[in-house]
């Protein structure tokens, strides 16, 4: 069992560490711009760091759910690779947003594409899982004819 989910677990841990990094950046920005908790407003430089962290945190549960469902029901390696791309895009998003609101857009779109790809892999994996055995076998035969190298 452990070998079957090791890549997913690794990407999950990387994601958790990235979330911790984002939180530490907010703490650092609070100190730099003298914004004490529970305040969430201050200079624009602080607010951008704060919003970037909150936005990344809001999407993290969606990312984790789709990563694991795609990895278990579609393909672990493909889901893990897509997950790493998503996390890298979120890091670039955070860094860009901290500098200016405009610089967040390109990595935001990249992370959205990665998340939608995980959703598609998860949905396709579940669809195939719930197909009756004869339909599933026919689908796999058709795919093997279509992709003989697979």
Curated annotation (Swiss-Prot):
GO terms for biological process: leukotriene biosynthetic process; leukotriene metabolic process; long-chain fatty acid biosynthetic process. GO terms for cellular component: endoplasmic reticulum membrane; nuclear envelope; nuclear membrane; nuclear outer membrane. This is Leukotriene C4 synthase. SUPFAM superfamilies: MAPEG domain-like. One of its GO terms (molecular function) is enzyme activator activity. Homotrimer. Interacts with ALOX5AP and ALOX5. Widely expressed. Glutathione binds at residues 30, 51-55, 58-59, 93-97. The gene is Ltc4s. The active site is at residues 31, 104. Disruption phenotype: Deficient mice developed normally and are fertile. However mice display abnormal inflammatory and hypersensitivity reactions. It comes from the Eukaryota. The chain crosses the membrane at residues 7-27, 49-69, 74-94, 105-124. It catalyses: leukotriene C4 = leukotriene A4 + glutathione; (13S,14S)-epoxy-(4Z,7Z,9E,11E,16Z,19Z)-docosahexaenoate + glutathione = (13R)-S-glutathionyl-(14S)-hydroxy-(4Z,7Z,9E,11E,16Z,19Z)-docosahexaenoate. PROSITE patterns: FLAP_GST2_LTC4S (PS01297). Residues 28-48, 95-104 are lumenal. Keywords: Endoplasmic reticulum, Leukotriene biosynthesis, Lipid metabolism, Lyase, Membrane, Nucleus, Phosphoprotein, Transferase, Transmembrane, Transmembrane helix. Pfam families: MAPEG. It is found in: Nucleus outer membrane; Endoplasmic reticulum membrane; Nucleus membrane. Its main location: nucleus. Pathway: Lipid metabolism; leukotriene C4 biosynthesis. Belongs to the MAPEG family. Its EC number is 4.4.1.20, 2.5.1.-. The modification Phosphoserine is found at residue 36. Residues 1-6, 70-73, 125-150 are cytoplasmic. Inhibited by MK886.
């Amino acid at each position: 069992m452990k070998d079957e989910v090791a890549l997913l677990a690794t990407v999950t841990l990387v994601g958790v560490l990235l979330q911790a990094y984002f939180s530490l950046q907010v703490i650092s920005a609070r100190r730099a711009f003298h914004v004490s908790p529970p305040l969430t407003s201050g200079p624009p430089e602080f607010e951008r760091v704060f919003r970037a962290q909150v936005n990344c945190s809001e999407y993290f549960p969606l990312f984790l759910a789709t990563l694991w469902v795609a990895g278990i029901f579609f393909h672990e390696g493909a889901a893990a690779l897509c997950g790493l791309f998503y996390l890298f895009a979120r890091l670039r998003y955070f860094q860009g947003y901290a500098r200016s609101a405009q610089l967040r857009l390109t990595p935001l779109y990249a992370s959205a594409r990665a998340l939608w790809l995980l959703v598609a892999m998860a949905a396709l994996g579940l669809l195939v899982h719930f197909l009756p055995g004869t339909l599933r076998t026919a689908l796999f035969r058709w795919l093997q004819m279509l992709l003989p190298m697979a």
